[in-house]
């Protein structure tokens, strides 16, 4: 039986258009899904739209739209965006779905019956923009006003009746959870302990009475379930949890091998403290990994409209193509820290990696084959040191790639792919096949190894550039690149190489 993996992105807030940070998160999850697929896993990948909250209601009012019409429109825009980005998924979550709302309501009442959720009064600070309650100790104070510590949005003081989730019932358990190797970043774990656990965990307000758009706890109640108890449970309702047909939930969560959430560092508190506690309260299995990544910044710092440095991903896709953008975001940015983006860096990475290294290797190899042979090139054993070394590099390449990918270090994984290309180009320089003739067996030995090296690189690149890799596979005489053929150096023995159209053209800024 195949192993399974369930991979999720956060569901994005539809009060505005998707930006570069959204495609960054989703691309990490999508690449991980593609990688796991070629490793033989059965995968389920979800993204979506977080459609409740006061901010959504206000935005719809501002546009003179019914709130449901507004979120329908935004969800369609999100779906169109992922099509443009050529990012496919198995499920698009919408928290306004009837099934999701029913299950969340049931969960609320189940936890209320268990006295994990209780009624009290909330007095404190609230950010409408971030849909988040904060204490005065968590907020930034300036000129007698309070501001959100991450977004800098001004906080309002509110006092209202609210239902609370008793987080403190789970304080000892969550400390143990944070010490497990589930959260990808140790720095984030230390930050969560320092800022929240060690200061004492405040019980969480999970309903509001002055909220115009959300899930009512029942038809007659003034209480509306507040964002995180609603939004986080879509990770389960996507799979049919709590519904009549729970087969996907059974397969990918309850009995699944891997359950992976990809999240930006700004929402780790909700995913690494609240979400595990919510699951524990229902005796549901934990995620096996929560991948927390940094932000995308520009050379001038964080993107903001006031700085005029906000990058529109749609413009980038139209200008460079979705695969070039996705390659840069996964191959040149580390999930462990904030990543710097600029068009200059994108173009430089593309030209250096894909044009100078990979495309140049293909064109040098194919040109020498076409100049010398009108037949397939067979794999011939060689005892020459340079041939044995390059064979070893090619055979070890995917193993090296996997050693990084298993740690979610895709930047290092793809760096190892490009390094193989550099070694193959150096192999050409060392063996100088242009001085050999077709009567010389050494020429066939070299060119066959170069073809096998190109195959290995293209196979790895197919994880982030499937369309371009597919074109190259066809040009080389294969239906697709396959893991099972990586170490079979005789795969080109019956393939006559034809002229290959250039797949990577140099970009000038």
Curated annotation (Swiss-Prot):
Motif annotated as 'HIGH' region, chain positions: 12-22
Enzyme class: ligase
Record-linked InterPro entries: aa-tRNA-synth_I_CS, Anticodon_Met, Met-tRNA_synth, Met-tRNA_synth_2, Methionyl/Leucyl_tRNA_Synth, MetRS_core, Rossmann-like_a/b/a_fold, tRNAsynth_Ia_anticodon-bd
Localization terms from the record: Cytoplasm
Residue ranges annotated as motif 'KMSKS' region: 302-306
Record SUPFAM superfamilies: Anticodon-binding domain of a subclass of class I aminoacyl-tRNA synthetases, Nucleotidylyl transferase
Keyword set, alphabetical order: Aminoacyl-tRNA synthetase, ATP-binding, Cytoplasm, Ligase, Nucleotide-binding, Protein biosynthesis
GO biological process, one term: methionyl-tRNA aminoacylation
Function description: Is required not only for elongation of protein synthesis but also for the initiation of all mRNA translation through initiator tRNA(fMet) aminoacylation.
Description of how the protein assembles with itself and partners: Monomer.
Similarity field: Belongs to the class-I aminoacyl-tRNA synthetase family. MetG type 2B subfamily.
Listed name of the protein: Methionine--tRNA ligase
Source organism (scientific name): Mycoplasmopsis pulmonis (strain UAB CTIP)
Taxonomic path: Bacteria, Bacillati, Mycoplasmatota, Mycoplasmoidales, Metamycoplasmataceae
